[in-house]
């Protein structure tokens, strides 16, 4: 199916607005789950590691299921998937208000809401790319800030709703707000297909005889009509078994031919269908082999291999602060009256700023995007190691802002992937990297929570987080250093055969 040329405006700006609010409404609560995390600790009395699974699943499931999400969007379109996912997110949030234990939240909030968010992210990005070409970067940048603005607003909103209506009332109201995703999805008008005439229906006489099982009876109607002219008639007679039926008087040779040709035609068609199924299975197997071969070739690229390790370690260590920072402040005995603004809100607004500014920096030709990404990883690791030394609200707020800004490196990650594998392999490589990012999101907060349950302090937990991010940054830095290319150039070259080739000079 071919779509019209991207309009780069017009209704596309409506798509940008509704995609922004779709990400705002869907990701607002899961990204600001740190406010709910503190309440769940008090409500269910479970360990921090087990409780952290709720928020980590909500963020990681959508990334882990990104191939399935892409399949749904390509099969059904952005509008139906958005409306269906709106029901998933809203229903999951409302079900979470009825949770009797933490295990119920794993399903209702972690899996249902997480899967809905993953579907919505894929749908909004896909339809935005369809409507924009030359302004695609601007459009994607605008809609991606929806999740960061949602984190900023929902952190304060959920805290206020908990004070007035309790935890269950907060989840019910937030779930009701998520129903507005249905209205946003209804405005996602798909691009019309290119103006081309629909194929005409094939006339019965144009269908080859081999596709008709009973072609011997139908291909010569005049012969059938001549039966009456030749004196053959059909009369109602009582058949030998006592049933009444219509007995037709036909020549014996014609009746035998009809009965012998029909099974042969049927067998021929069965053989053709069997061969078609074999060819289809062979083709699918070849596609699977090609996919595995392309995946193996990607991991032969040392920079790509270092990149997947870096993104995995970055999400293991860098994601927990957005979930646990509120509980960190409480564990460091920061007074409630000192929390003038939720730390999660500061984290969210600075993430939006980081996405914008880092994206602008990546467009400068004199800046190497790979080195810029490595710099964000190393500074993030150092900031994580500094959290145990922050014992006041001001220092925690400063570190939250720094970590939020550096988390905005998600906006330059597609640039980094493109520079590593090329534009032709971008979709394949990006899907693999997003899978590992989802794995890191799912594992990071529980690991930090388990460290707290073991040591009763967040100090060792954030030292571990900082070490993971620093390790990933240095691995990627070593992979992209030009000294590796210099070493390869110094390797002895194979002996060149003593055969001379002469090329005729031409003026072409």
Curated annotation (Swiss-Prot):
Q: Where in the cell is it found?
A: Cell membrane
What does it catalyze?
Answer: creatine(in) = creatine(out); (R)-carnitine(in) = (R)-carnitine(out)
Predominant localisation class: membrane
> What UniProt keywords are attached to this protein's entry?
Cell membrane, Membrane, Transmembrane, Transmembrane helix
Q: Look up the record and give one Gene Ontology term from the biological process aspect.
A: urate metabolic process
The way this protein sits in the membrane is described as: Multi-pass membrane protein
GO cellular component terms, alphabetically, are: plasma membrane
Bilayer-spanning residue ranges: 13-33, 53-73, 80-100, 102-122, 137-157, 164-184, 303-323, 341-361, 370-390, 396-416, 431-451, 460-480
Which residue ranges are assigned to the Cytoplasmic compartment in the record's topology? Answer: 1-12, 481-508
Its biological purpose is as follows: Extracellular pH-and Na(+)-sensitive low-affinity creatine transporter. Also functions as a pH-independent carnitine efflux transporter.
Q: Which family does it belong to?
A: Belongs to the major facilitator superfamily. Monocarboxylate porter (TC 2.A.1.13) family.
The protein's name is Monocarboxylate transporter 9
Q: What is the gene called?
A: Slc16a9
């Amino acid at each position: 199916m071919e779509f019209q040329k991207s309009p780069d405006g017009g209704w596309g700006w409506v798509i940008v607005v509704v995609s922004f609010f779709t990400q705002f409404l869907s990701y607002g609560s899961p990204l600001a789950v740190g406010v709910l995390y503190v309440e769940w600790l008090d409500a269910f009395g479970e360990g921090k590691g087990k409780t952290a699974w709720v928020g980590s699943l909500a963020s990681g499931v959508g990334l882990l299921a990104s191939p399935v999400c892409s399949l749904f969007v390509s099969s059904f379109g952005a509008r139906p998937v958005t409306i269906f996912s709106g029901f998933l997110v809203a229903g999951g949030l409302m079900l979470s208000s009825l949770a009797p234990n933490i295990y119920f939240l794993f399903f209702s909030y972690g899996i249902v809401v997480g899967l809905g968010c993953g579907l919505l992210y894929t749908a909004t990005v896909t339809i935005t790319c369809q409507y924009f070409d030359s302004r695609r970067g601007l459009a994607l940048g605008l809609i991606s800030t929806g999740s960061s603005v949602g984190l900023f607003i929902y952190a304060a909103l959920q805290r206020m709703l908990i004070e007035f209506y309790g935890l269950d009332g907060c989840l019910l109201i937030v779930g009701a707000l998520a129903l507005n995703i249905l209205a946003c999805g209804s405005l996602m008008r798909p691009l019309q297909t290119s103006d081309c005439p629909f194929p005409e229906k094939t006339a019965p006489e144009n269908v080859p005889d081999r596709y008709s099982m009973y072609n011997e009876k139908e291909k010569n109607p005049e012969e059938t009509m001549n039966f009456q002219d030749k004196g053959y008639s059909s009369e109602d007679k009582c058949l030998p078994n006592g049933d009444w039926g219509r007995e037709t008087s036909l020549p014996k040779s014609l009746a035998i031919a009809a009965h012998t040709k029909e099974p042969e035609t049927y067998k021929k068609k069965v053989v053709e269908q069997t061969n078609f199924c074999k060819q289809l299975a062979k083709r699918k197997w070849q596609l699977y082999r090609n996919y595995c071969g392309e995946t193996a070739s990607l991991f032969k690229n040392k920079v790509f291999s270092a990149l997947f390790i870096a993104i995995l370690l970055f999400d293991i260590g860098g994601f927990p602060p957005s979930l646990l920072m509120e509980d960190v402040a409480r564990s460091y005995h920061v007074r409630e009256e000192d929390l003038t603004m939720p730390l999660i809100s500061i984290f969210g607004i600075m993430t939006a700023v980081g996405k914008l500014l880092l994206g602008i920096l990546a467009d400068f030709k004199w800046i190497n995007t790979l080195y810029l990404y490595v710099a964000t990883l190393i500074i993030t690791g150092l900031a994580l190691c500094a959290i145990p030394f922050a014992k006041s609200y001001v220092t925690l707020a400063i570190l939250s802002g720094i970590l939020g800004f550096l988390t905005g490196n998600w906006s330059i990650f597609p640039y980094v992937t493109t520079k590593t594998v090329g534009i032709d392999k971008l979709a394949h490589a990006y899907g693999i990297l997003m899978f590992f990012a989802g794995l890191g999101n799912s594992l990071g907060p529980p690991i930090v929570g388990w460290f707290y349950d073991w040591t009763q302090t967040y100090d060792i937990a954030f030292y571990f987080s900082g070490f993971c991010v620093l390790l990933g940054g240095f691995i990627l830095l070593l992979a992209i250093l030009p000294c590796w290319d210099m070493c390869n150039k110094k390797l002895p070259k194979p002996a060149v055969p003593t055969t001379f080739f002469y090329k005729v000079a031409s003026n072409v």
